[in-house]
Amino acid sequence: MDLAGLLKSQFLCHLVFCYVFIASGLIINTIQLFTLLLWPINKQLFRKINCRLSYCISSQLVMLLEWWSGTECTIFTDPRAYLKYGKENAIVVLNHKFEIDFLCGWSLSERFGLLGGSKVLAKKELAYVPIIGWMWYFTEMVFCSRKWEQDRKTVATSLQHLRDYPEKYFFLIHCEGTRFTEKKHEISMQVARAKGLPRLKHHLLPRTKGFAITVRSLRNVVSAVYDCTLNFRNNENPTLLGVLNGKKYHADLYVRRIPLEDIPEDDDECSAWLHKLYQEKDAFQEEYYRTGTFPETPMVPPRRPWTLVNWLFWASLVLYPFFQFLVSMIRSGSSLTLASFILVFFVASVGVRWMIGVTEIDKGSAYGNSGSKQKLND
């Protein structure tokens, strides 16, 4: 390991990233709270401000991926479709197999200048998580309870609110509903057999109702669906801890642009269309494992400097007073003060490990591990 790699793996560096993220995130959340005063006066101004405040938070995680770890992402796509990326609203359908696939989705949004306005379909519990969840709340993310009878109206209402959103955006959705594991895959394929659907080797059975209502609600606002199939070269198994340690990964992303008018308007036909899409995605993954590449022309969108500039700004803003406080604490020589600092250090280290742990596949959501009644209804 070279000197830079050794430095990046040090826990002290991880604590610095964690401190900057938490301190700046709470400051930004506070500013977002005050922007609520704008909502009844000028809703579009509220949205534009929060779009940029959101970028200040989410771009810090993208910075870790693109600048700290140096992860490279090659896009395989039709050159004619490539010219439209970033210039239109789109629904992005991404497979959900890797611990950092959400970061790769954000990186895709960032490369085309749409990170601040990008949306996700997320479970409603995340709305209560400080920093990320609160940021999502202020940027009108769509939250679901994963119970269709409850989500039918609430998700549709939230999506309708996005029809007059003033910024371009990617709406990222994992139609599988949960991250791929062997156990979830086995259960999912039992459902596929019960429904008479072809077996998928590399994906879970897609949840069609959420996709259908998204397409129906955003029709004539969103121009296309971007079918994105992600994999990593040389059987790399990327993790957030690896990114934090500065490990470089090599992502390949196959992107197909499908005009929204090509997707059926009828819900049942739309569901059948999505199942066919996932059968095609599965074939693309199988071909990737066989040949090491995707179809179409490989392209590397340029890495933009703004994620790094944003992090350096917030780091200089919050680290200077912290180090001043730390120096004054050490100079005081008080055993109680030093004990308090050690306690804070310990709590921070536990916090860092917890934040990393929630992204790990073996500690992921239990959704999809049980059974069948709900899946048969999807």
Curated annotation (Swiss-Prot):
Pfam families referenced in this protein's UniProt entry, alphabetically: Acyltransf_C, Acyltransferase
GO cellular component, one term: endoplasmic reticulum membrane
Name assigned to this protein: 1-acyl-sn-glycerol-3-phosphate acyltransferase delta
Gene Ontology biological-process annotations: CDP-diacylglycerol biosynthetic process
Domain of life: Eukaryota
Family: Belongs to the 1-acyl-sn-glycerol-3-phosphate acyltransferase family.
Swiss-Prot/TrEMBL domain comment: The HXXXXD motif is essential for acyltransferase activity and may constitute the binding site for the phosphate moiety of the glycerol-3-phosphate.
Catalysed reactions, semicolon-separated: a 1-acyl-sn-glycero-3-phosphate + an acyl-CoA = a 1,2-diacyl-sn-glycero-3-phosphate + CoA; (4Z,7Z,10Z,13Z,16Z,19Z)-docosahexaenoyl-CoA + 1-hexadecanoyl-sn-glycero-3-phosphate = 1-hexadecanoyl-2-(4Z,7Z,10Z,13Z,16Z,19Z-docosahexaenoyl)-sn-glycero-3-phosphate + CoA; 1-octadecanoyl-sn-glycero-3-phosphate + (9Z,12Z)-octadecadienoyl-CoA = 1-octadecanoyl-2-(9Z,12Z-octadecadienoyl)-sn-glycero-3-phosphate + CoA; 1-octadecanoyl-sn-glycero-3-phosphate + (4Z,7Z,10Z,13Z,16Z,19Z)-docosahexaenoyl-CoA = 1-octadecanoyl-2-(4Z,7Z,10Z,13Z,16Z,19Z-docosahexaenoyl)-sn-glycero-3-phosphate + CoA
Keyword Transferase: yes
InterPro entries, sorted: Acyltransf_C (IPR032098), Plipid/glycerol_acylTrfase (IPR002123)
Membrane topology, as annotated: Multi-pass membrane protein
Keyword Lipid biosynthesis: yes
Entry-linked SMART domains: PlsC (SM00563)
Transmembrane segments: 11-31, 125-145, 307-327, 338-358
